[in-house]
């Protein structure tokens, strides 16, 4: 838990615009402590409705998209990874999330992330990062995300 607190302190200072980052695959792009940057986008009920349809979610709780589904916010963790590191075939392994509040139609969604681990396991290259999703600067979701960014099979073909 201490690592999350440290990572979030770093994230508060991030303010990096992903569009200015070179999309790269070198190891330095995934080094522990690397800030993946901050993305900002408006959240609208229309986007929420599209997500609910794609996810086949029909709970009235989300008010036809006016309240953001947690899956929509979690997907931003994938996007921030893809926006920073060139990805070929990759695998979303696991996410551990905490919900802190709601994101509503018309609010600005902001996603921040920082690398906490970059390891090789069973031949797979795995990156772990802490992330936050904010709704108009209020914490809505935080979590940790694990992804195999280079599967063993891809590495074996590349090195053959």
Can you say where each PLM-predicted feature lies in the sequence?
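Short, well-ordered coil↔helix boundary/capping segments
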Residues: 71, 97-105
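A beta-strand/beta-hairpin structural motif
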Residues: 92-96, 144-146
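Short structured motifs
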Residues: 94-100, 114-115
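Hot-dog-fold acyl-thioester-processing enzymes
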Residues: 7-94, 154-160
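HotDog/MaoC-like acyl-thioester-processing domains
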Residues: 1-31, 103-108, 112-160
């Amino acid at each position: 838990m201490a690592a999350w607190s440290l990572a979030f302190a770093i994230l508060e200072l991030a303010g990096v615009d992903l569009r200015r980052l070179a999309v790269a695959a070198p190891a330095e792009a995934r080094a522990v402590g690397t800030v993946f940057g901050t993305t900002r986008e408006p959240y609208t009920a229309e986007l929420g409705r599209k997500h609910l349809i794609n996810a086949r979610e029909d709970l009235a709780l989300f008010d036809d998209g006016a309240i953001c589904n947690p899956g929509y916010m979690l997907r931003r963790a994938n996007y921030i990874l893809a926006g920073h590191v060139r990805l070929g075939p990759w695998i979303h392994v696991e996410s551990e999330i905490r919900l802190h509040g709601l994101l509503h139609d018309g609010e600005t969604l902001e996603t921040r992330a920082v690398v906490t681990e970059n390891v090789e396991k069973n031949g797979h290259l795995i990156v772990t990062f802490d992330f936050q999703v904010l709704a108009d600067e209020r914490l809505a979701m935080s979590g940790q995300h694990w992804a195999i960014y280079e599967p063993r099979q891809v590495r074996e073909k590349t090195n053959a």
